[in-house]
């Protein structure tokens, strides 16, 4: 809606001003010329055979050089660093992660679903939307820096999460990735917190680095990949345990036989306790708040 978009714009503008203030605090104090000055100077140099040669370009401003195979370690570092810096400047302290299928339509459009079962799953669009709204309202009551909703920034469940956060008047994060069939990010991601990735691995790190809870809705290969990597990190002690909520017991038990893994001994009986099934936004919110301390304690941090 126009009101929702305007509210989201105002929230984004407020945070952008905070970001500019933060950047001002981090301006350099050393006497050396900075990189931006030299980029501008290099644009105005005389046009000669030497200055047109690729070798003459400043290394950090040379796209062809940055795309070389040998520069992969640098590109990995940049993809880790850029979102980290921008989220820090926005004051993002922690997140609530929403994983879920891009093909799940909102209920009003379920007639367009590719299969009858996808149409049935459309109710999880509303659950994700309501849950994100509840989490964001709680976050705003605590100062708006903790438990920021983060999604993959695409359609389906991801759109629902960002949409619910915007409807609550808060910000949300979208971690997109370049895919052959990918379209633009959904319109509900806070623009200054909408990121684009080349590396799946770095993208998944940013999903989990600040996570206070992980919520998994029905989805496909991407959702399964994100779910199993998150579970593996928690199971192996590489990540602290956080509430791990699976929306839709019937869906998950239909495609994954967790008990069979335990019976086979390939996972331990206690590993089954890592996940909690929920059906509604309200149920998930109650579990999340209980794990965080108390739903009623919403003091500003």
Specify the residue positions occupied by each region the protein language model found.
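Short, solvent-exposed amphipathic alpha-helical segments in soluble enzyme
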Residues: 166-167, 229-234, 260-264, 292-293
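C-terminal functional extensions of proteins
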Residues: 246-301
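Solvent-exposed alpha-helices and their adjacent loops that cap or buttress functional pockets
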Residues: 88-91, 141-143, 166, 186-189, ...
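Glycine-rich beta-alpha loop segments
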Residues: 29-46, 50-59, 63-175
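C-terminal amphipathic helix plus adjacent low-complexity
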Residues: 25-28, 33-40, 288-301
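Short, acidic/small-residue loops that bind anionic groups at enzyme active sites
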Residues: 169-182, 217, 231-258, 269-270
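Phosphate/pyrophosphate-binding betaalpha-module
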Residues: 149-151, 155-217, 221-222, 228
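Short, Lys/Arg-enriched N-terminal segments with co-localized hydrophobic residues
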Residues: 1-22
């Amino acid at each position: 809606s126009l009101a929702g978009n305007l509210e989201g714009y105002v929230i984004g503008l407020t945070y952008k001003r905070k970001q500019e203030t933060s950047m001002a605090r981090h301006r350099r104090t050393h006497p050396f010329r900075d990189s931006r000055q030299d980029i501008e100077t290099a644009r105005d140099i005389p046009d000669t055979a030497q200055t047109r040669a690729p070798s003459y370009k400043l290394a950090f401003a040379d796209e062809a050089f940055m795309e070389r195979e040998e520069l992969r370690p640098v590109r990995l570092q940049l993809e880790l660093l850029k979102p980290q810096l921008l989220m820090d400047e926005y004051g993002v302290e922690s997140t609530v992660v929403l994983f879920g299928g891009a093909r799940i339509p909102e209920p009003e459009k379920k007639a367009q679903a590719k299969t009858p079962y996808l149409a049935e799953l459309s109710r999880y669009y509303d659950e994700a939307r309501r849950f994100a709204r509840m989490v964001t309202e709680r976050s705003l009551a605590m100062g708006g820096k903790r438990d920021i909703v983060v999604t993959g920034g695409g359609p389906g469940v991801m759109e629902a999460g960002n949409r619910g956060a915007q409807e609550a008047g808060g910000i949300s994060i979208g971690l997109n990735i370049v895919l052959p069939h990918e379209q633009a990010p959904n319109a509900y991601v806070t623009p200054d917190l909408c990121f684009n990735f080349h590396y799946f691995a770095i993208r998944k790190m940013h999903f989990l680095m600040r996570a206070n809870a992980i919520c998994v809705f029905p989805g496909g290969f991407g959702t399964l990949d994100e779910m199993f990597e998150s579970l593996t990190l928690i199971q192996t002690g590489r990540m602290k345990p956080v509430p791990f909520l699976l929306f839709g017991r019937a869906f998950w038990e239909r495609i994954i036989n967790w008990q069979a893994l335990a019976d086979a001994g390939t996972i331990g009986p206690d590993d089954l306790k890592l996940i909690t099934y929920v059906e509604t936004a309200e149920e998930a919110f109650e579990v999340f708040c209980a794990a965080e301390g108390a739903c009623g304690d919403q003091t500003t941090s």
